[in-house]
A protein has these predicted regions:
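Electropositive nucleic-acid engagement tracts
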Residues: 18, 22-23, 34, 38-115, ...
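Short, flexible loop/turn elements at secondary-structure junctions
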Residues: 64, 98-101, 140, 248-250, ...
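Short, Lys/Arg-enriched anionic-surface-contact patches
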Residues: 10-26
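Active-site-proximal, Lys/Arg-enriched surface segment
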Residues: 66-184, 331
Length: 514
């Protein structure tokens, strides 16, 4: 089956996601336009790519700004085919969780704010304006041969920060209290302590509440709950365990204490985190004090790394293009105050792997990894492979921004700013799924040939999928016409490339004189 046919088949369930049939057809047409258009991926370029640049374009823009539809419904085809992509009937659903920033330059875009630039150097912090999103991608891999996993995005939730209200009275009061010399901290502190604090206005109280609700970790919890509901709604995935792999920013109390049912979290932890052992059953409590909840202090993750008494276990996992033996140390049933006394954890310390930049060079080592898991009895190969495969979501971010053009649309409506990037991520995810269902995980001869300077790739890249989709759309109308080449243009050029010159003036005068 062609990639175009499979992609069109996956778009058919979108009809139920939109209120009218013509709205669903318009969404499918824009999906093809956003994938096949060149340069910036704008709605106007998508309209031109579908050949409707001479028709009324207002309905295409109203699809994202006014039409009532749920962006989560666009990812339903991924969940419908998820059970067929897993290794077995008991295999867990592995999900990678991360946030990303889409840069914007407009000052009147709803939700755009200043944030830390991830491309800034480590010695100097830079700021940039952009839109924040929290993404979750399902990790699937081939079962018949060792190969890297493929991340299929299933959620792309906007996470705009709360807007701080402007209180003119508080600004004047603060300026009046600091009229003294700012270089005298004692005088300023005395003035600050001598006067009572100004009570918060209702707008400021609402801002503090929204600031907590719109934090990235809180949005991440909402994404996990939405994924669990989507899995429970299908008989093939309702009993499967949801295995979430996140980075250190999500390993905190907010996420660990609000995990949905049948959900396991794997995340990085500080090397100096204070852990505790389990409390013995018969433990005396000091008179007059509160009851103990934790046992003796356990070694920190860094101490576990350097402790030679703990056994070293080698786990077989696929990483960096081949199957490797990764050495780890484990410590089961430890407790962390951020997670609570009722949640036992599994500590996994991954020793740094040695590598050489060239043959015969000095042996270098990477940084160790300190992981915790909310399921102390989880299979170690599954745990470590899930953590290694989390890197695929970073590849999603790169392809979404550079090839799909997520958040490049020049829209200013609050709904369009949030739903247009979600629409683009949904069609990108369906394109990845269509390639797996049509051709499998390997890069076969069906794809367009690679240039001579590129090595053979194990799996097709996103650019390979876009080129193949464009070829299957635009090539059939040109099959009955001769394909032009550079030789055809060269044959049309005259034999004498130089223009014919007029005779010199001296020759002309001599001719006249003769």
């Amino acid at each position: 089956m062609l990639l175009l046919e499979k992609f069109h088949e996956l778009l058919q369930p979108w009809r139920s996601a939109f209120p009218q049939q013509r709205t669903g057809q318009r969404a499918q047409r824009l999906a093809y336009g956003l994938l096949t258009c060149l340069r910036t991926h704008l709605t106007s370029n998508a309209i031109c790519a579908t050949g409707r640049q001479f028709l009324d374009w207002s309905a295409d823009y109203r699809l994202f700004s006014r039409s009532p539809w749920d962006p989560h419904a666009l990812f339903d085809p991924i969940f419908d085919h998820l059970a067929d992509l897993l290794a077995s009937a008991q295999a867990p659903v592995v999900v990678a969780l991360d946030d990303t920033l889409c840069k914007k330059t407009g000052r009147h875009i709803p939700g755009a704010t200043f944030a830390r630039d991830p491309q800034s150097p480590p010695f100097h912090l830079n700021l940039c304006r952009g839109l924040r999103f929290v993404q979750a991608s399902v990790l699937v891999r081939a079962t018949r041969f060792p190969a890297p996993a493929r991340a299929l995005p299933v959620r792309f939730e906007p996470a705009p920060p709360a807007v701080k209200p402007k209180n003119q009275n508080r600004t004047r009061h603060h300026a009046r209290n600091n009229q003294g010399n700012p270089r005298n901290p004692k005088k300023t502190a005395a003035k600050r302590n001598s006067k009572t604090t100004t009570p918060l206005t209702p707008e400021e109280q609402q801002y503090r509440l929204q600031k907590k609700l719109r934090a990235l970790t809180q949005v991440g919890v909402g994404v996990l709950q939405s994924l669990r509901q989507a899995l429970d709604a299908r008989p093939a995935t309702c009993q499967r365990q949801l295995l979430v792999s996140g980075d250190g920013s999500y390993t905190n109390r907010t996420v660990l204490r609000q995990l949905p049912q049948r959900t396991t979290f794997i995340g990085r932890i500080r090397k100096d985190a204070k852990l505790f052992q389990a409390l013995p059953p018969a433990t005396a409590t000091r008179s007059g004090g509160r009851p103990r909840r934790y046992g003796a202090v356990a070694p920190t993750p860094e101490q576990v790394l350097h402790d030679d008494a703990l056994p070293l276990v080698k786990i077989r996992c696929f990483a960096a293009g081949e199957v490797r033996q990764i050495p780890v140390k484990i410590l089961r049933h430890v407790y962390w105050r951020k997670a609570g006394a009722d949640l036992p954890l599994l500590l996994v310390v991954v020793k740094p792997l040695g590598y050489r930049l060239r043959k015969g060079s000095k042996l270098l080592y990477r940084q160790p990894a300190f992981l915790i898991c909310t399921d102390p009895e989880l299979d170690l190969p599954t745990l470590l492979q899930s953590y290694i495969d989390r890197w695929e979501i970073e590849c999603n971010h790169r392809d979404e921004k550079s090839l799909i053009g997520v958040a490049q649309g020049q829209v200013w409506n609050s709904q369009a700013v949030a739903r247009l990037p979600q629409f683009q991520v949904a069609i990108y995810s369906l394109l990845l799924l269509a390639s797996i269902l049509a051709y499998g995980f390997k890069r076969t001869a069906t794809y367009l040939p690679l240039p001579l300077w590129r090595r053979k790739s194990i799996r097709p890249s996103t650019l390979d999928l876009l080129n193949l989709l464009r070829d299957q759309i635009f090539a059939p109308p040109m099959q009955h016409k001769p394909t032009p080449s550079i030789d055809d243009f060269a044959a049309l050029a005259p034999v004498d490339a130089n223009a014919t010159k007029l005779p010199l003036a001296s020759e002309t005068l001599c001719t006249i004189a003769a």
